[in-house]
Each structure stands twice: as structure tokens, then as C-alpha cells.
Amino acid sequence: MKSLQKGFTLIELMIVVAIIGILAAFAIPAYNDYIARSQAAEGVSLADGLKVRIAENLQDGECKGPDADPQSGVVGNEDIGKYALAKIEGDYDASKTDAGAPNGCKVEITYGQGTAEGKISKLITGKKLVLDQLVNGSFIAGDGTDLADKFMPNAVKAKK
């Protein structure tokens, strides 16, 4: 009398393991890109916070204001996040009046200099995103940016 087969054969198990390996080969790089994109987006959030400081400084005709001084309550020209450090740079150009033209003020975002050093994606560590502020107050990626285009937030990509 024949006995009934119970369980899976070795070949069936090997096929399942091979399929999982193939799926992981596609999923892991995509997941790493997703993590890098989400961490890169923090830099733009920091830059948005610096818009108010730039607007205040522009009242005095400058992009940068005084350096931070906790004693007097001056907040300074930079903001630090979990994954990035954002600094106000540039020289204001009052001659620019077209809403879509850069006004000379920039925010330089350096990834890997935040409070979570070592916990940032290696794909963006040490990269810079330089945002030029336009006359209308919005930002666009400018010269000096070495952050890969696939990690750059859509809000600041140059229209082509």
C-alpha cells in the first residue's frame, strides 16, 4: 500500500526561495531609494522654515542676518534637522523684479550634518542641495547642487 506524501519536496522549497530572492533583489534598492528621498525632503522643510528669516533680513536689504545669540534671542542663519543642516547664503539683488527670477538669496542644505549623524542614507550623505530663492518667495534648485535628481523633491526641481 502506498503512503500519502505530506509536506513539500526539496525542489519546491528551492523554487520558493529563488522567487523570494528575485523579489528581494528588486525591492531592497527601491526601498533604499525611498528612504533617501524621504530624508532629502527634510532639507526642503528646513528651507521653508528659513523663508521667514530671509524675509525679515530682506527688510534690512540682506539675505543673511546676525549670527545666532541665545542670550539676546537672535535665531541666526541656520537650522538643523535630523538629517540635514540648512544655512542662509547669498547676496540680495534688489534689481531683480521678475517673480520667477532668483533674488540672490540661497539656502544651502548639507545632508549628513543633522542630529542623526550616521543614521542617514549613504546615497545622500555629504550631498548638497542649494536652493535659490525667487522674487516670489519660492525655491528652485540652483548651482552647486550635487544631490542626485532622483532624490530631489519635486517642489524644487527646475522645470525643463
Swiss-Prot record:
Q: Its GO CC terms?
A: membrane; pilus
Alphabetized SUPFAM superfamilies for the sequence: Pili subunits
Swiss-Prot/TrEMBL keywords? Disulfide bond, Fimbrium, Membrane, Methylation, Transmembrane, Transmembrane helix
Q: List the disulfide bonds.
A: C63-C105
In what way does this protein cross or attach to the membrane?
Single-pass membrane protein
**Signal peptide, first to last residue:** none
A GO biological process of this protein is: cell adhesion
Q: Which residues cross the membrane?
A: 8-28
Q: Where in the cell is it found?
A: Fimbrium; Membrane
Give residue ranges for the propeptide. 1-7
PTM sites of type N-methylphenylalanine: F8
Gene3D superfamilies with a match to the protein in the record: Glycoprotein, Type 4 Pilin
Keyword Disulfide bond on entry: yes
Superkingdom, taxonomy of origin: Bacteria
> Keyword Glycoprotein: yes or no?
no
Could you give the subunit structure recorded for this chain?
Answer: The pili are polar flexible filaments of about 5.4 nanometers diameter and 2.5 micrometers average length; they consist of only a single polypeptide chain arranged in a helical configuration of five subunits per turn in the assembled pilus.
Q: What does this protein do?
A: Major component of the type IV fimbriae that plays an essential role in twitching motility, natural transformation, and protease secretion.
Sequence similarity = Belongs to the N-Me-Phe pilin family.
Please identify the protein, giving its name as recorded.
Answer: Type IV major fimbrial protein FimA
Q: Gene behind this chain?
A: fimA
